[in-house]
């Protein structure tokens, strides 16, 4: 039996993956789901507890709880990492903290299982903005604005990806990075068409339903993509809603601007104090 682990199943990405697996799952699949709120998950998927194909096991806990993670990751060949922070709050470390916790649990499994240990594949949601080939398709000024506004979120994701890369070199895991464009229609349930890409042209928008289907395809074809970034582009119509995205950009940009101003104020203060002391000594 194939076992998939899903972290963050109540968010838009995790829900789309779970919905796709429930409707088009491979034969003999077991899904181990880690969520902060089992009640919230069952409200979104009321038939989950009676589902027999695939088998579903729900664990309530956080993505940094070693006991919950150990139960969720046990025997998993695929780990969908969909835990994410809404917006881009300064100092966020959710992704990197989760990555460290996952790697720690996998290290323990590797040590206990010895030669029989089989590394799982982490399917990590990233962003086309962090993929040089795909980011180059966006006007430079737009890319700079987005990178500035979402600096904290991107820094967190990049650090998590560095941890996965280091762990791969140690034989602890494999990883695949999934790079979609802007994501829309969080409540939509029907995919309208997508395609996996490398450096080809990428549409501006993608639905969450198509992202979920794409991540499931990537998991099915995991051996083709180990250690690589995979882009996703829409081939069908996408119901676009820019309000939430623009709000995240505005909030992230405002926070980043305040941080920059505060840093410059501190530097100016230190320089001024140094000059005062220097003048006094002279």
UniProtKB/Swiss-Prot annotation:
Pfam assignment, any one: NAD_binding_10
Gene: avfA
Physiological role: Involved in the conversion of averufin (AVF) to versiconal hemiacetal acetate (VHA) in the aflatoxin biosynthesis pathway.
EC numbers, comma separated: 1.-.-.-
One Gene Ontology term of the molecular function aspect: oxidoreductase activity, acting on the CH-NH group of donors, NAD or NADP as acceptor
Any GO BP annotation: aflatoxin biosynthetic process
Pathway membership: Mycotoxin biosynthesis; aflatoxin biosynthesis
Name listed for the protein in its UniProt record: Averufin oxidase A
Annotated family: Belongs to the avfA family.
Disulfide bonding pattern of the chain: none
InterPro entries hit by this protein: NAD(P)-bd_dom, NAD(P)-bd_dom_sf, Polyketide_Oxido-like
Top-level division of the source organism's lineage: Eukaryota
Entry keywords, A to Z: Oxidoreductase
């Amino acid at each position: 039996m194939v076992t998939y682990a899903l972290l963050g199943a109540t968010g838009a990405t995790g829900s789309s993956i779970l919905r796709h697996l429930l409707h088009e799952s491979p034969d003999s699949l077991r899904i181990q789901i880690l969520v902060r709120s089992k009640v919230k998950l069952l409200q979104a998927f009321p038939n989950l507890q009676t589902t027999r194909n695939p088998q579903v096991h729900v664990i309530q806990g956080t993505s940094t709880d070693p006991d919950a993670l150990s139960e969720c990751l046990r025997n998993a060949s695929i780990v969908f990492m969909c835990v994410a922070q809404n917006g881009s709050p300064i100092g966020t470390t959710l992704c990197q903290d989760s990555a460290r916790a996952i790697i720690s649990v996998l290290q323990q499994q590797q040590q206990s299982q010895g030669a029989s240990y089989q590394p799982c594949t982490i399917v990590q949601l990233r962003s086309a903005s962090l993929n040089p080939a795909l980011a180059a398709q966006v006007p430079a000024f737009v890319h700079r604005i987005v990178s500035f506004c979402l600096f904290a979120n991107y820094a967190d994701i990049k650090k998590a990806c560095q941890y996965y890369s280091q762990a791969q070199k140690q034989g602890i895991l494999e990883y695949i990075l999934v790079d979609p464009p802007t994501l829309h229609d969080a409540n939509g349930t029907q995919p309208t068409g997508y395609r996996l890409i490398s450096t080809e042209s990428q549409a501006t928008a993608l639905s969450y339903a198509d992202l979920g289907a794409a991540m499931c395809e990537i998991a099915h074809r995991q051996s083709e993509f180990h250690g690589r970034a995979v882009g996703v582009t829409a081939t069908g119509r996408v119901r676009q809603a820019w309000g939430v995205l623009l709000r995240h950009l505005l909030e992230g940009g405002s926070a980043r601007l305040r941080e920059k101003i505060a840093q410059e104020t501190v530097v100016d203060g230190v320089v001024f104090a140094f000059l005062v002391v220097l003048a006094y000594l002279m």
